[in-house]
Amino acid sequence: MTNIESKHGIVSRQPYELYMSFTDLSNLAKMLPEDKKEMVTADMDTLSATVQGFNIGVKVHQRVPYSRIELVDYGAPFAFHVVLHFEPAAENPYHTDFWIMVEADLNLMMKMMLSGKVKEALDKVVDGLVDASNGKMPEGFDVSKWAGQ
């Protein structure tokens, strides 16, 4: 198994607030730019997307309230497990130490091709959440479509 861990980011929201934003996977689809939404289908427990001609999906495996959400592959060409962590930040319990861990069953070639790109994408997600929690929204992001508002 290949293990990939994102950087940790301190999000300026309490763990329960951030956790609740991720409990319904359809919220993630709502945040996408309009030109990407047609490639994604989602409901409370599943999210599927077509990326560069490949279909890949996740479904919720376990929710641990205000602490962790575990996702597993769902119609993907390889097995993987994703864990979103929402822990109180050590220096401020009203902020969240957020990070993502991925465990994937990749052969050596796929590991060499994908590991760096997956790590980079995970770090961008963490950075985006940190920035958004501090009022810096990504270009093209429509706050009115976010269910957490």
Put a short name on every predicted segment.
Residues 137-149:
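Short acidic DE-rich linear segments
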Residues 8-12, 59, 85:
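Generic structural detector for well-ordered beta-strands
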Residues 75-127, 131, 140:
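Beta-strand/loop substructures that line and gate deep hydrophobic ligand-binding cavities in soluble
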Residues 4-6, 54-57, 78-83:
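Short, surface-exposed coil-to-beta transition loops
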Residues 18-22, 28, 47, 60, ...:
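Hydrophobic pocket/interface hotspot
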Residues 1-41, 149:
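Hydrophobic ligand-binding cavity/cleft-lining segments
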Residues 29-30, 38-77, 148-149:
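Glycine-rich portal/gate segments that line the openings of hydrophobic small-molecule binding cavities
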